[in-house]
């Protein structure tokens, strides 16, 4: 089996090294990732300039583009490697709740899913770098189960690993997405020339972390698996919307 691996933290990140190393024990691996950190770019494509594909000394390929670009190139350029699965991550920091809409890590998996390829996004609920051992041990458990009976139809799973010591992981839970409040205000500043600039403010606090959500369960020490879908249609609102637009 062939697994194409990407991320949004860049090809030099610790997370993608862990993901590639463990996955290589179960399948053939090819890494195609952004050349630099592209966190928060979501499903964006690079359309205003050409892309370049280069190979690093460790064998990983990198692209001067987005995670979505990487999936397109990974599936189009290599005649000797067509992915059976796409793994994205391991992201340095969680991708839970509505964060998934902004995540380039989740976007890479989403793009693969749109191509008909089963895809999984992996994230670690920690940005300090302290819990990579937990992520690696959890990944061994997850992939051993995954490859024992691989999915036969396209799936899109978002997996978050808790920020606890390896022995304190409590198991796996299937969880729905939680919610955050909207992000905090932009931060005004001045550049060295005295010109007005702005920084995007911090993320909002979590507003829905009850039992059964990814925020709640991962925060309680569980690995969370959330099945995602692409269809954004609000089906419960179809009748009300029709009544509004068809009213006399």
Curated annotation (Swiss-Prot):
Assigned EC number: 3.1.3.5
GO-annotated cellular components: cytoplasm
Compartment(s) where it occurs, according to its Swiss-Prot or TrEMBL record: Cytoplasm
Listed cofactors: a divalent metal cation
Pfam families according to UniProt: SurE
List of residues binding a divalent metal cation: 8-9, 39, 91
Cofactor note: Binds 1 divalent metal cation per subunit.
UniProt xrefs under SUPFAM superfamilies: SurE-like
Leader peptide range in chain numbering: none
Reactions mediated catalytically: a ribonucleoside 5'-phosphate + H2O = a ribonucleoside + phosphate
GO molecular function, one term: 5'-nucleotidase activity
Main localization (coarse): cytoplasm
Keywords assigned by UniProt, alphabetized: Cytoplasm, Hydrolase, Metal-binding, Nucleotide-binding
Enzyme class, spelled out: hydrolase
Family membership: Belongs to the SurE nucleotidase family.
Function: Nucleotidase that shows phosphatase activity on nucleoside 5'-monophosphates.
Listed name of the protein: 5'-nucleotidase SurE
Species this chain originates from: Neisseria meningitidis serogroup C / serotype 2a (strain ATCC 700532 / DSM 15464 / FAM18)
Gene for this chain: surE
